[in-house]
Amino acid sequence: MADDTAPHPPTQRYPLLDLLSWYNKCAPQTHCTPQRPLTTTTQTVQTEQHTTCPSKPHRHENDTDSVDSRHHSTCSTQTPASPASPAHPWTLDCVGSELTVKTVTSDGTTVEVRLRL
C-alpha cells in the first residue's frame, strides 16, 4: 500500500509552478510516488518513472561542469496524445543539484527551465 503521507504531484492551475513545488517537497530527502495521474486544467500527465534525486555532490567554487556521473537520476512524466488535445510532454531531470523542467506549449514552442539548487 502506498504511503499516504508522501507529497502528491501538482494538481492545480499552474503546472510548472506546481511541478517545481512538488519537486522541492520531494527531493532529496524523500522518494516521491504520486498516488494518481497528474491532472491540470489543460492536460493529464501519466507517471512513467520515479527515482529519488541524489544529494548535492561536493563542488568547488565556480566549478559548474563537475557533476559526478554516479549522482545521476531521472524523473520523467509525459502526456499521452489524444485526438481532443495535442500532447504536451513534460520531463523532469535532476542531475546532481540541478533541476531541468522541459515542456512544449500548444503552439509548438519548447520551454526549458533550469534551476541550480
Swiss-Prot record:
> Compositional bias of type Low complexity: which residue ranges?
31-53
Location comes to: Host cytoplasm; Host nucleus
Q: Which UniProt keywords apply?
A: Early protein, Host cytoplasm, Host G2/M cell cycle arrest by virus, Host nucleus, Host-virus interaction, Modulation of host cell cycle by virus, Phosphoprotein
Q: Which InterPro entries match?
A: Papilloma_E4
Which residues lie in Basic and acidic residues bias regions? 60-71
**Post-translation changes:** Phosphorylated by host ERK. The phosphorylation triggers a structural change that enhances keratin binding and protein stability.
- Is Phosphoprotein found in the keyword set? yes
Q: Which GO terms of type biological process are on file?
A: symbiont-mediated arrest of host cell cycle during G2/M transition
GO cellular component term, pick one: host cell cytoplasm
Q: Where is this region: Disordered?
A: 31-89
Q: What else is known?
A: The major E4 form is first synthesized as an E1^E4 fusion protein from spliced E1^E4 transcripts, such that the first few amino acids of the E4 protein are derived from the N terminus of E1.
Provide the assembly information. Answer: Assembles into oligomeric complexes. Interacts with host CDK1. Interacts with host SRPK1; this interaction may favor expression of late viral transcripts. Interacts with host cytokeratin components KRT8 and KRT18.
Report the sequence similarity comment from the record: Belongs to the papillomaviridae E4 protein family.
Q: What does this protein do?
A: Contributes to multiple aspects of the viral life cycle including viral genome amplification, suppression of suprabasal cell differentiation and egress of newly formed virions. Induces host cell cycle arrest at the G2 phase by associating with and preventing the nuclear entry of host CDK1/cyclin B1 complexes. Inhibits cellular DNA replication by preventing loading of host replication licensing proteins MCM2 and MCM7 onto chromatin. Within the cytoplasm, associates with host kinase SRPK1, a splicing factor regulator, and inhibits its activity.
Its name, as the record gives it, is Protein E4
Q: Which organism encodes this protein? A: Human papillomavirus 42
Question: Per UniProt, what is the name of the gene that codes for the protein in this document?
Answer: E4
